[in-house]
């Protein structure tokens, strides 16, 4: 069932691919056609596009990028799954189809830097796409937030007081696979 969703709709949930970009329609996010001189592609991923809980992360991060004046675009309905799940489930043919499709699209629109909030997409884009002949600077959203915070992009915002619990989940794909442990902690300090 999941493979059929990937093959026909480019997502494991089997949701209509023409709704992939619905989350950003009211936010004024541009596509590469509208902003061909973008600096960053915000690659949202399947969960960030379709899962209602994860969309909250996508929307909040988008608003931070906009507040900081970052020149970015999203692919919206044209985004295809990065291929991570198909590859992990053993469907290498389907994964390579998705990877090659994305690489062609990235090349066509001139992608050089990719930001993503999804740890699975981050690991795949950063460590597996270069095996297919093309690599990019891939940045996890916590790295971008840390950098923008250091530059003072969010002055006037609320700061964590240090009182009470602050919970952060160290994703396997960020921590163990990419050694990104301190980045989110730096943001909270």
How would you describe each model-predicted region?
Residues 44, 140-142, 170:
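Short, structured patches in soluble enzyme cores that scaffold and shape functional sites
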Residues 132-162:
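Short, flexible loop segments at boundaries between secondary-structure elements
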Residues 121-123, 144-147, 172-176:
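Short, catalytically relevant binding-site loops at active-site mouths
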Residues 56, 97, 139, 143, ...:
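Conserved active-site and cofactor/substrate-binding residues in soluble primary-metabolism enzymes
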Residues 150-189:
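Redox cofactor-anchoring modules in respiratory/redox and cofactor-processing assemblies
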Residues 1-117, 122-129, 133, 148:
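Iron-sulfur-cluster electron-transfer modules
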């Amino acid at each position: 069932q999941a493979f059929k969703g990937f093959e026909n709709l480019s997502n494991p949930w089997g949701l209509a691919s023409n709704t992939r970009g619905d989350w950003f329609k009211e936010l004024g996010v541009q596509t590469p056609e509208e902003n061909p001189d973008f600096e960053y592609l915000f690659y949202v991923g399947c969960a960030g596009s379709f899962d209602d809980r994860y969309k909250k992360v996508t929307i909040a991060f988008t608003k931070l990028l906009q507040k900081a004046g970052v020149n970015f675009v999203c692919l919206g309905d044209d985004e295809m799954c990065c291929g991570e799940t198909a590859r992990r489930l053993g469907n290498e043919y389907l994964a390579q189809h998705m990877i090659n499709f994305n690489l062609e699209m990235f090349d066509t629109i001139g992608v050089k830097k990719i930001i993503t909030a999804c740890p699975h997409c981050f690991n795949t884009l950063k460590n597996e796409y270069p095996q297919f002949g093309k690599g990019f600077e891939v940045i996890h959203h916590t790295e971008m937030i840390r950098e923008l915070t250091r530059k003072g992009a969010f002055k006037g915002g609320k700061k964590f007081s240090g009182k009470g619990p602050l919970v952060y989940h160290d994703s396997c794909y960020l921590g163990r696979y990419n050694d990104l442990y301190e980045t989110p902690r730096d943001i909270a300090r």
